[in-house]
């Protein structure tokens, strides 16, 4: 009806007409907890997703203006392997936004802004899932980031797989007995767990061969918890933490497709996520994972195992909720590029890593090989905008990572690095003056 106003509390205005900050109305005046020190100094060449370049590193120091003892605010955070970083897209250049955007991954096609990670949003807030390398005093050290130097960070939250993964968030409707109006639990009783649980998983159809799945690794899942046996060995735990630093579905759902795992990411999305049920902390203390390795028969001090059949994730059955993403996320029209270096660029990179007196050395990378792999990861994802891909194909492309200023050009299916020289312009941090960020006004 005409004249019908939106429900909700009305924002109060000052005499000058400005909206007062208030929690009730959602009009907030935020203050960054810190400013990121990143290996990327500008937007050009910065990865659009954190998983593109695992070698990208950053440091975030909590400001004493927020807490007198910043180290107190980080107490206990070192027990987590990954953290959510909530930040501001401070280099947008303008506050305006559109309902439809053209993300580079769609190569010119339009879609709704809320179905993308576009920085141009009604509230210019970004979200990154980064690997926590270490906590040192009032600072945290991160890797696998997609934020530039000087980014205002609003908040830090630990990544908890049990809460942040979409699997098992809700139970399928079939689990409810509508006749008796009683809820039937998903778990199997202890007496039947060794037989019925495995049979039911095989009948669910999860053990059918997948078209793109690698034969080197089969999907496995933790066994229904019935006892404290069948723990993973140390080598298995290390292998899983290296291959699966987070749930694959949550990674795909947030656009975190790793270039190195493209051959298996599609198959894992079709099968379902690898589902460790405990913390992904690298230390792995007090929380171990269980899995089915077949029926283990203990005889004296020796355990004989029978051949293992493929299983689907624990607690999952036909009709169970799972994470779903559009096809353009997993099968983007933008192809992965081959990256190559000219001999001159290889020589330039070697000179940057030398420890000559008076020459700057890498601040975020530990070696020239790490810098090279980071450059390869950035270029293989084609960091150019849609405009540059279509109208500036003959132009050189420049970007800076750490202290390396990279010059390259793009051809048909490849990117070639022509020159690498020390970055000339120092990166300046945003000062505390004018650091307040207004959101929701």
Curated annotation (Swiss-Prot):
<dbReference type="InterPro" id="IPR023368">
    <property type="entry name" value="UPF0066_cons_site"/>
</dbReference>
<feature type="binding site">
    <location>
        <begin position="47"/>
        <end position="49"/>
    </location>
    <ligand>
        <name>S-adenosyl-L-methionine</name>
    </ligand>
</feature>
<feature type="region of interest" description="Disordered">
    <location>
        <begin position="179"/>
        <end position="231"/>
    </location>
</feature>
<dbReference type="InterPro" id="IPR036414">
    <property type="entry name" value="YaeB_N_sf"/>
</dbReference>
<keyword id="KW-0808">Transferase</keyword>
<keyword id="KW-0489">Methyltransferase</keyword>
<keyword id="KW-0949">S-adenosyl-L-methionine</keyword>
<feature type="binding site">
    <location>
        <begin position="148"/>
        <end position="151"/>
    </location>
    <ligand>
        <name>S-adenosyl-L-methionine</name>
    </ligand>
</feature>
<dbReference type="InterPro" id="IPR040372">
    <property type="entry name" value="YaeB-like"/>
</dbReference>
<dbReference type="Pfam" id="PF01980">
    <property type="entry name" value="TrmO_N"/>
</dbReference>
<feature type="binding site">
    <location>
        <begin position="90"/>
        <end position="91"/>
    </location>
    <ligand>
        <name>S-adenosyl-L-methionine</name>
    </ligand>
</feature>
<protein>
    <recommendedName>
        <fullName>tRNA (adenine(37)-N6)-methyltransferase</fullName>
        <ecNumber>2.1.1.-</ecNumber>
    </recommendedName>
</protein>
<feature type="region of interest" description="Disordered">
    <location>
        <begin position="264"/>
        <end position="284"/>
    </location>
</feature>
<dbReference type="GO" id="GO:0089715">
    <property type="term" value="F:tRNA (L-threonylcarbamoyladenosine(37)-C2) methyltransferase activity"/>
</dbReference>
<feature type="domain" description="TsaA-like">
    <location>
        <begin position="30"/>
        <end position="168"/>
    </location>
</feature>
<comment type="similarity">
    <text>Belongs to the tRNA methyltransferase O family.</text>
</comment>
<comment type="function">
    <text>S-adenosyl-L-methionine-dependent methyltransferase responsible for the addition of the methyl group in the formation of N6-methyl-N6-threonylcarbamoyladenosine at position 37 (m(6)t(6)A37) of the tRNA anticodon loop of tRNA(Ser)(GCU). The methyl group of m(6)t(6)A37 may improve the efficiency of the tRNA decoding ability.</text>
</comment>
<feature type="binding site">
    <location>
        <position position="117"/>
    </location>
    <ligand>
        <name>S-adenosyl-L-methionine</name>
    </ligand>
</feature>
<dbReference type="GO" id="GO:0030488">
    <property type="term" value="P:tRNA methylation"/>
</dbReference>
<feature type="binding site">
    <location>
        <position position="127"/>
    </location>
    <ligand>
        <name>S-adenosyl-L-methionine</name>
    </ligand>
</feature>
<keyword id="KW-0819">tRNA processing</keyword>
<feature type="compositionally biased region" description="Polar residues">
    <location>
        <begin position="179"/>
        <end position="192"/>
    </location>
</feature>
<dbReference type="InterPro" id="IPR036413">
    <property type="entry name" value="YaeB-like_sf"/>
</dbReference>
<dbReference type="InterPro" id="IPR023370">
    <property type="entry name" value="TrmO-like_N"/>
</dbReference>
């Amino acid at each position: 009806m005409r004249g019908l106003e939106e429900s909700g509390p009305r924002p109060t205005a000052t005499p000058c007409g400005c909206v007062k900050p208030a929690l009730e109305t959602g009009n907030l005046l935020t203050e960054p907890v810190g400013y990121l020190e990143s290996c990327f100094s500008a937007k050009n060449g910065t990865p659009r997703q954190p998983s593109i370049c695992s070698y990208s590193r950053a440091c975030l120091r909590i400001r004493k203006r927020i807490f007198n003892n910043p180290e107190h605010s980080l107490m206990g955070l070192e027990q987590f392997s990954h953290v959510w970083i909530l930040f501001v897209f401070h280099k947008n250049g303008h506050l305006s936004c559109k309902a439809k955007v053209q993300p580079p991954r769609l190569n010119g096609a339009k879609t709704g802004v809320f179905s993308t990670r576009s920085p141009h949003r009604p509230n210019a807030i970004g979200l990154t899932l980064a690997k926590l390398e270490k906590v040192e005093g009032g600072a945290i050290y991160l890797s696998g980031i997609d934020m530039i130097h000087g980014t205002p960070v609003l908040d830090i939250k630990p990544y908890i797989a049990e809460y942040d993964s979409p699997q098992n968030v809700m139970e399928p409707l079939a689990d409810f007995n509508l006749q008796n109006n009683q809820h039937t639990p998903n778990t199997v009783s202890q007496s039947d767990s060794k037989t019925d649980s495995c049979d039911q998983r095989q009948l669910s159809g999860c053990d059918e061969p997948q078209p793109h799945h690698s034969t080197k690794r089969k999907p496995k899942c933790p066994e229904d918890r019935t006892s404290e046996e069948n723990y993973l060995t140390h080598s298995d735990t290390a292998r899983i933490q290296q291959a699966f630093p987070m749930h694959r579905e949550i990674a795909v759902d947030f656009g975190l497709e790793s270039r190195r795992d493209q051959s298996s990411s599609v198959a894992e999305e079709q099968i379902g996520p690898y589902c460790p049920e405990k913390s992904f902390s690298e230390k792995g203390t007090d929380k171990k994972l269980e899995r089915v390795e077949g029926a283990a028969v203990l005889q004296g001090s020796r355990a004989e195992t029978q051949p293992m059949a493929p299983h689907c994730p624990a607690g999952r059955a036909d009709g169970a909720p799972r994470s779903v993403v559009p096809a353009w996320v997993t099968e983007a029209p933008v192809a992965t590029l081959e990256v190559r270096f000219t001999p001159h660029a290889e020589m330039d990179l070697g000179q940057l890593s030398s420890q000559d007196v008076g020459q700057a050395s890498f601040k975020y990378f530990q070696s020239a090989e790490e810098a090279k792999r980071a450059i390869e990861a950035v270029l293989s994802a084609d960091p150019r905008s849609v405009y540059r891909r279509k109208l500036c194909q003959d132009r050189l492309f420049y970007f800076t990572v750490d202290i390396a200023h990279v010059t390259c050009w793009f051809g048909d299916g490849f990117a070639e690095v022509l020159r690498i020289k020390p970055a000339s312009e120092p990166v300046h941090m945003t000062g505390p003056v004018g650091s307040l960020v207004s959101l929701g006004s």
